[in-house]
């Protein structure tokens, strides 16, 4: 576990050092590509900028498995200059207090340099979701540019990982860690895809376009790896969550069986392995985008605090997850990739399938 922990946290720290909003994920994209090259995995980039890495399986009849996460996070896009300050459009769901005056932000230049500033309150009509941004040190900028909350890139705080963008860099980091483990051990039965999408926060755009295009084989089982607001039954510190649905869909039992079989295997191997199961209806994840286009889908979720940087009492703060939930999620999806061909043999399926002879006989005796 110590090697897994060190590598997983290093990947996540590297990803977190690259702030990104929808349509401006360039530096996260480069970091993902860099790590994939270090792992020794080839990848392709589709016409929409989504990244697809692949590990080939040993059994051509086994279902492929895809694990999907997005690279963007809610923030602002600076669109124009206004009397020496800058108009910025909200990109994705941000807390209501983001539209107040005095919220510290970082403006991200094309070379990655960050310029500090703060909001000056709402600009225009409320439904336009715009703010005015004032730079700490006035200078001429060339829009469009991303602006993000001035929060920590990455911090390990006891049992918590705190980041501006846990959602969904934790998903991306977990996929990269799982691919690292799978590439250095025995090959999985089916092909395994690591998928890194764009513009999720403004409507699952990258995932929808990729699913529509049929980039993944139609028989692929798709797992969405998300960081989602903790709630009863999906509580921080109680383990990775098998997500059985979201606000839009109940996901498919066949795809979920891969995760259930992986959970059973891990709990037999490690008596303390924690895993929860819950329908998380607080929002919609990328599994729904693939479900609409006919894929069998399921999901995992890291229970998240300060969802979209919204802290109690309206404060803007870093998101956070439990470090052991994160590491457990990596173990779960790694094991799931190895259990694709074994998913019909979950304990529950076997118990339901195999009617005890005495009960069968009693039904026969009393059936007429």
Where do the model's predicted regions map?
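N-terminal hydrophobic/helix-forming segments and targeting peptides
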Residues: 1-368
């Amino acid at each position: 576990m110590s090697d897994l922990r060190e590598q997983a946290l290093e990947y996540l720290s590297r990803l977190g050092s690259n702030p990104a909003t929808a349509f401006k994920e360039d530096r996260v994209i480069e970091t993902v590509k860099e790590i994939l090259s270090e792992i020794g995995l080839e990848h392709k980039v589709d016409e929409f900028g989504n990244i697809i890495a692949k590990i080939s399986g040993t059994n051509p009849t086994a279902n492929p498995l895809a694990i999907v996460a997005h690279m963007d996070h809610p923030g602002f896009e600076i669109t124009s200059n206004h009397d020496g300050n800058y108009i910025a459009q909200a990109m994705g769901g941000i807390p209501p207090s983001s539209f107040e005056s005095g919220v510290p932000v970082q403006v991200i230049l094309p070379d990655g340099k960050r310029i500090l500033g703060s909001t000056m309150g709402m600009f225009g009509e409320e439904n336009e979701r715009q703010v005015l941004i004032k730079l700490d040190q006035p200078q001429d900028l060339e829009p469009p540019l991303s602006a993000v909350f001035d929060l920590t890139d990455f911090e390990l705080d006891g049992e918590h990982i705190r980041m501006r963008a846990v959602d969904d860099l934790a998903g991306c980091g977990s996929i990269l860690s799982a691919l690292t483990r799978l590439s250095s051990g025995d090959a999985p039965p089916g092909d395994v895809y690591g998928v890194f999408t764009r513009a999720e926060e403004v409507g699952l755009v990258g995932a929808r376009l990729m699913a529509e295009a049929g980039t993944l084989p139609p028989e692929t089982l798709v797992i969405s790896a998300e960081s989602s607001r903790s709630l009863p039954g999906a509580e921080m510190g109680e383990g990775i969550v098998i997500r059985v649905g979201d606000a839009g869909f109940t996901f498919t039992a066949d795809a979920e069986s891969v995760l259930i079989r992986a959970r059973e295997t891990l709990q037999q191997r490690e008596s303390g392995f924690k895993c929860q199961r819950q329908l998380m209806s607080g929002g919609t994840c990328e599994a729904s985008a693939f479900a609409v286009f006919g894929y069998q889908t399921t999901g995992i979720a890291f229970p998240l605090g300060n969802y979209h940087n919204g802290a109690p009492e309206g404060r803007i703060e870093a998101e956070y997850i439990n470090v052991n939930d994160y590491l457990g999620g990596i173990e779960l999806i790694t094991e799931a990739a190895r259990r694709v061909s074994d998913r019909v043999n979950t304990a529950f399926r076997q118990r339901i399938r195999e009617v005890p002879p005495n009960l069968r006989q009693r039904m026969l005796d009393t059936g007429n």
